[in-house]
Amino acid sequence: MKTIIVALLSMVFFVNNTNAQGTEESIHRVGVVINQDYFLKFVKPGLNQDRNYTMGAALPVFQYAKMGEKGWVYAPHRFLAKSILGKSVTNYRLADATVMLANTTFTPLYLGNLHDPESEYKRKNDRPFASLNFIGTSFGVKQDSGNELLSIGINVGAIGLDVSKAFQTTVHRDHWFGTVADIPYGWEDQISDGGEPTLLVSGKYDWLIVGKSDGSGNNKGNFQLSANTELRLGYYVSGSAGINTRVGLLDKRNWGMNTLPISSGYSIVSSQKNPFELFLMGGLKGNSWLYNALLMGQFRNSPYTLSFKQLNKFTMEWNLGVGTKIPFCKNRAIRASVMAVGRSPEFSTVKEFERWHSWADLQLYYEW
């Protein structure tokens, strides 16, 4: 962990020294994203159950729109954006290019106590252990008006590595943060144990409904409402539609929001001339599902998986939190947000294993 932090800080200072005098559109953003149900114990102790979506982290997240202009990394993103927009692509301009290294972890309530006489019953009817490690890239273009945004994401990684197993076992065994949870012994039965390549391609379209910039140059506002729709193909086959809102001291150009687990919450890399912001934010999203590899397995046989019949074909998600941007010096700022996120049951087996679950989303960025 110390090595990762040192590398992150070194990258920040190196890029800062070489690019701090960029143009208005060359803003950089580097930061971290942490998803953890542990932090909800301070709201209500019962919400921290190490269950379902247990934890996730992206370290670092780096955003710089000009990365997407050329090169092979974002060539698929540019191709997909042009294919979707067709001739209207000339009315759009680059708004974001993001790269991150990330992990997500999923566990059942039952952590593998082999002395439990109901062990097999619990393993078969709860969700399986699952983990995903990936390099995520995203590319966004917004309409010239600034009120519509198309985002293309591609995640390349592996399901079934031992990163989550090692971290969770260490935390529970050594009682980090005062945890008294059981040591997990079920990771040997995780989805695709030993590792298996995986891929996800996503396309998301956001449009601003209320709080649009009027083009006068006055971008201050107090309320914004946007809608979005998304399609995901790969280790997830699903679609979604939702709404997001921001209320407070706003720069209306910064309306783009992303509430997916382990993603930059800010899908527009705006200009360096942003004012102070402080706002409440919230959203509601409905998801339709045909496939979830982290529940149903992928190509490799896994001892515990859920069937298509057991997969809930419709789920709901909500989010509520607070965000801020604090500018300092001439072109620099700190951006931070804290958000609670909830999700309805993802599968149907027996009632004791079906539940809404929630987690905290923490994001911190340095901009220059």
Model regions: which residues?
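Short glycine/proline- and aromatic-enriched beta-strand/turn motifs that initiate or cap beta-hairpins
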Residues: 21-69, 101, 107-111, 289-295, ...
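Long, hydrophobic/aromatic-enriched structural stretches that serve as scaffold segments
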Residues: 78-167
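Outer membrane beta-barrel transmembrane domains
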Residues: 29, 109-117, 244, 249-368
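Residues that define the transmembrane beta-barrel architecture of outer-membrane proteins
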Residues: 51-57, 129-133, 150, 193-199, ...
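Short loop/turn motifs that connect adjacent beta-strands in outer-membrane beta-barrel proteins
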Residues: 21-27, 65-95, 142-151, 207-225, ...
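Extracellular loop and loop/strand-boundary signature of outer-membrane beta-barrel proteins
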Residues: 44-45, 119-125, 182-189, 228, ...
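Transmembrane beta-barrel strands of outer-membrane/channel proteins
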Residues: 28-36, 97-105, 154-160, 203, ...
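Residues on the lipid-exposed face of transmembrane beta-strands in outer-membrane beta-barrel proteins
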Residues: 57-63, 101, 135-141, 156, ...
